Design a protein with these regions (language model features):
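Catalytic lumenal/periplasmic loop and adjoining terminal transmembrane helix
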Residues: 1-172
């Protein structure tokens, strides 16, 4: 739902930051722009990653009917050194680096899916769209070792599996 909304409302090639999970589970699956995919391939090659990882990126890149984006991952404490993963960030850096959109995935009932409170405070007032699966008073129950956001009980409080996705548009001028 969120990926489809982004593809319909955000121009191809736009710079999008995804916050704040180390896992890609739960984030909208967006296609990389050709330039972003080439940059990642080059950096992964220098880091010694195999052809399998390259092929994964190429498969994403080949979905030509879908728009591609320059994706940045916002992850505090990440020390990977990749240009697309930022461990230090705030609204000023996002503006300086011309990030137009921020996509935040979070889920209050799972430890691995929390937003960054300092960035969340800075993004107040920039919200454009939210996809929230929580609909009722029932609290969903999860297998703590499962990263797929599929409840095992407490379904009365859910409209769908997955985290809450919030999309923000930042004024980069």
């Amino acid at each position: 739902m969120a990926a489809r909304w982004i593809e319909q409302h955000v121009a191809a090639g736009a710079k999008i930051a995804r916050c704040c999970s180390r896992s890609l589970y739960g984030h909208p699956q967006l296609r990389l722009s050709l330039g972003a995919a080439e940059q990642r391939k080059a950096e992964l090659s220098r880091a010694g990653y195999s052809y399998r990882r390259w092929r994964y990126l190429q498969a994403i890149e080949e979905q030509a009917s879908r728009p591609g984006y320059d994706l940045v991952e916002l992850i505090r404490g990440d020390d990977s050194g990749y240009s697309w993963t930022w461990s230090q960030y705030d609204l000023n850096r996002l503006r300086r680096e011309r990030v137009e959109w921020v996509v935040v995935q979070e889920y209050p009932h799972l430890n691995y899916s929390h937003s960054d409170p300092s960035l969340a405070a800075q993004l107040q007032g920039y919200a454009v769209k939210t996809f929230d699966p929580l609909t009722g008073a029932a609290t969903p129950v999860y297998d703590r070792n499962d990263a797929f956001y599929l409840a095992v009980a407490g379904f009365g409080g859910l409209s769908r599996p997955g985290p809450k996705i919030s999309i923000y548009r930042i004024d980069t001028q």
